[in-house]
Swiss-Prot record:
Belongs to the KptA/TPT1 family. It comes from Streptomyces coelicolor (strain ATCC BAA-471 / A3(2) / M145). One of its GO terms (biological process) is tRNA processing. It holds the Pfam family PTS_2-RNA. One of its GO terms (molecular function) is tRNA 2'-phosphotransferase activity. Its EC number is 2.7.1.-. Removes the 2'-phosphate from RNA via an intermediate in which the phosphate is ADP-ribosylated by NAD followed by a presumed transesterification to release the RNA and generate ADP-ribose 1''-2''-cyclic phosphate (APPR>P). May function as an ADP-ribosylase. Keywords: NAD, Transferase. This is Probable RNA 2'-phosphotransferase.
């Protein structure tokens, strides 16, 4: 499968499994799962045909493991803006997690901390490298270390998705380490 096609199918899956399943006539269950055959048929009916083999390739090769397959069903691993309950167990985070962003967001983050915005949870990375890649999608990355151990000790709840993304409702700015001003 061509890389360009892989990216297009992946973006299509993300859009319709995380944000707009109704646009192609899908109704995920409470856990965000849809039948793969229904997804493939709906995509074809709405002008974006792909095969089960292409879908399997996208799932297997996605470096961020954005999708989970269970039997005949598929869902996005996290990042939904639609109402879903991923039923992720509560997890004890490592001492530090990381958030990738860009400089233009730092003032708001200092004032409000990290908020989920249009998603259900704040997404945190387990390492600086991953957070750097996340931040780089929007420009020159800035990585903010998160004192996850102290947050957890203070009662904040963490979950970890199947693809290793750490999730929490909010990260108050007192738990963040900001870069020194230039």
């Amino acid at each position: 499968m061509q890389q360009e096609r892989t990216v297009k199918v992946s973006k299509y899956l993300s859009k319709h499994l995380r944000h707009q399943p109704e646009r192609i006539g899908l109704t995920p269950d409470e856990g965000g799962w849809v039948e793969i055959d229904a997804l493939v048929a709906a995509a074809a009916a709405h002008g974006f045909p792909f095969t089960r083999q292409e879908l399997d390739h996208v799932v297997a090769t996605n470096d961020k493991r954005r999708f989970a397959v269970e039997g005949t069903r598929i869902r996005a691993s996290q990042g939904h803006s639609i109402a879903v309950d991923l039923r992720l167990p509560v997890a004890t985070p490592p001492p530090y997690l990381y958030h990738g962003t860009v400089a233009r967001h730092l003032e708001a983050i200092r004032a409000e901390g990290l908020r989920p915005m249009n998603r259900h949870d704040v997404h945190l990375s387990p390492d600086r490298e991953t957070a750097t890649r996340v931040g780089a999608r929007r420009g020159r990355p800035v990585v903010l270390p998160v004192d996850a151990a102290t947050m957890h000790r203070d009662g904040h709840v963490f979950h970890v998705s199947a693809n290793g993304v750490w999730l929490t409702q909010h990260v108050p700015s007192r738990y963040l380490r900001f870069p020194a001003p230039h």
